[in-house]
Structure formats: C-alpha cells, structure tokens
Amino acid sequence: MLRQTLTQASRMRPCISVVGFRGFHASSPCEATLKEIEQRLKSIKNIEKITKTIKTVAQTKLTRAQRAMEASNKYYRVSDEVFKEAGTKAPEEGKTLMVACSSDKGLCGGIHSSISRLIRRELHDPKTFENTSLCILGEKVRTQLLRFCPESFYLTFAHIGGASPSFEEALQISSNILEHAKDYDRIVLVYNKFASAVSFETVMKNLYTTKAINESPNLSAYEVSDEVHQPLMEFAFANAIFSAMAEAHCSEMSSRRNAMENASKSAGDMINKFSIQYNRQRQASITNELIDIVTGANSLA
C-alpha cells in the first residue's frame, strides 16, 4: 500500500465529544442532588456554546465555499464541454481505480459515511471487488473503509479539508494519482455533490483517460496534435478533481452547520429539562426545610 501525504497542512479544529452522565437519570429527580444537576447544566451549556460557535464558523465558510464551488463548476463545465463535443466516451469497464473525495474533519453528520456506504455497495460484487483499487482523499473515509477492505487500498492522501481547496492542491493530487494509475483502464470519482443548503447527493463519475481522448471521433475538428492529448487529459483530470473537491467541501460545510444546529437545539432542550428539574428539586428542598422549621417551632411551643 502506497501512502501519499500532501505537504499543504490544514488548520486542525479541536474535537468535541458529548459524554453521557453515568449514574444520572433525568426521569428520576430524587436520584440527583442539586449540586449534581447544577454541574450537568454547566457542562451542557458549555457544549451548547461550542456547537453554536462551530455552527457560526461553518456558516461563514459555507458562504465562501459556495462561491468557490460555483467558480470551479463554471470552469469545469467549459472544459468538459470540449470532450462532449468531441464525442469522448469515458470507459465503463476494466481494471478500475476508485477515487473517494472526503476530508480529515468530523462533526459533519453523515457526509463521510455516505461515501463509505456507496463504495461498500459497489465492492459487494466479487468481480468488482477483484478489479477495483481505492484512492482515498481524507482520513475519515480511509478509517471507515480500513475495516472493510484494507487490501483494496492503493493510494491515500491526508491533510484534506482544512480550507477551501485550490487548483494547486488538486493538481498535486491528480499528478500523484496519474503517476500511479498507468495500469488502470478507468478512473472513477466518488464525491458528495452539493444539492442545497440542507442536502447533498453522493455520486460516481467516470473520468476521461488518454485512450478515450485519442479515440474521440470528433476531436480532429479542434485541430489538436497527438502530443497534446496526454497534457490535455492531465488538465481535464485535475479540473475534475478540483471541481469534486470544491463540491465536497461545500457539502461538508453545509452538513457541519446543520449538524451543529441540531446539536445546539438538542442541548437547549436538555438545558430546559434540567432547569425545570433543578427548580423543582430546589423548591422541594426549600419546602422540606420550612416544614422542619415549623415542626421544630411547634414542638418548642
């Protein structure tokens, strides 16, 4: 297994875990003291602050990611139109290299598991499993698939997803992939396509190879010399990787914002429940103390 790591490192975001409270049940108020409930409330409020902050950051990044995605898609559509007009057909059979586009970041719902599920579904067929190798962009999908098909791994890339992807980053990735993909008949790209602010679609896209470009029936209309075919394919491949990374990054930011919004709402609901329980417990404690005082005063009278 060959592991390729990009030199462009991303800023790492702290990981947050919501830990359950052992020995405490909200349905049994008598089991918890006022101090315990107060500690739980404080912890949940801190988590709520963190989730709201992550949501705000994700919302800001989503706006920038959408602009970057729209720009990359316009550029890719113009590039892809050339091959469509030339009648280029991407290969659909043969030894396959499947490129999964994800990232190293979590706290974004099912954005990574959806890619893993699609790949597992494709590799469920024994013939496909035998003829397919994996190239993974990002640690999340790599970790998920490592338990399922470690023998299928061929290339992995880390430090993906820190900021909006650049064409330079996509070019580094595509160059490394093409350098080690000479023995493959087809290359398939798996990524999350941005649909709206609340949804995404996991898709597979067949990419053009040098052989497919050489066999294009109408390519001669562009008067392209044969020695340009290979650089043209490399540019088209880098363009496709860049567009997919921009789509995946935008989908990730949207999913993270939605996940943190749901987490903030859940934290708010828990705060309300524990606040009610705290007030009831405190009221019961005060009532019991008043009863003890009145009872003691009556016994002395």
From Swiss-Prot:
It is a peripheral membrane protein. Its main location: mitochondrion. Disulfide bonds: none annotated. GO terms for cellular component: matrix side of mitochondrial inner membrane; mitochondrion; proton-transporting ATP synthase complex. F-type ATPases have 2 components, CF(1) - the catalytic core - and CF(0) - the membrane proton channel. CF(1) has five subunits: alpha(3), beta(3), gamma(1), delta(1), epsilon(1). CF(0) has three main subunits: a, b and c. It comes from the Eukaryota. GO terms for biological process: proton motive force-driven ATP synthesis; proton motive force-driven mitochondrial ATP synthesis. SUPFAM superfamilies: ATP synthase (F1-ATPase), gamma subunit. This is ATP synthase subunit gamma, mitochondrial. PROSITE patterns: ATPASE_GAMMA. CDD domains: F1-ATPase_gamma. It comes from Schizosaccharomyces pombe (strain 972 / ATCC 24843) (Fission yeast). The lineage of its organism: Eukaryota, Fungi, Dikarya, Ascomycota, Taphrinomycotina. It is found in: Mitochondrion; Mitochondrion inner membrane. Mitochondrial membrane ATP synthase (F(1)F(0) ATP synthase or Complex V) produces ATP from ADP in the presence of a proton gradient across the membrane which is generated by electron transport complexes of the respiratory chain. F-type ATPases consist of two structural domains, F(1) - containing the extramembraneous catalytic core, and F(0) - containing the membrane proton channel, linked together by a central stalk and a peripheral stalk. During catalysis, ATP synthesis in the catalytic domain of F(1) is coupled via a rotary mechanism of the central stalk subunits to proton translocation. The keyword Membrane applies. Keywords: ATP synthesis, CF(1), Hydrogen ion transport, Ion transport, Membrane, Mitochondrion, Mitochondrion inner membrane, Transit peptide, Transport. One of its GO terms (molecular function) is proton-transporting ATP synthase activity, rotational mechanism. PANTHER family: ATP SYNTHASE GAMMA CHAIN (PTHR11693), ATP SYNTHASE SUBUNIT GAMMA, MITOCHONDRIAL (PTHR11693:SF22). InterPro entries: ATP_synth_F1_ATPase_gsu, ATP_synth_F1_gsu, ATP_synth_F1_gsu_CS. Belongs to the ATPase gamma chain family. NCBIfam families: ATPsyn_F1gamma. The keyword Transit peptide applies.
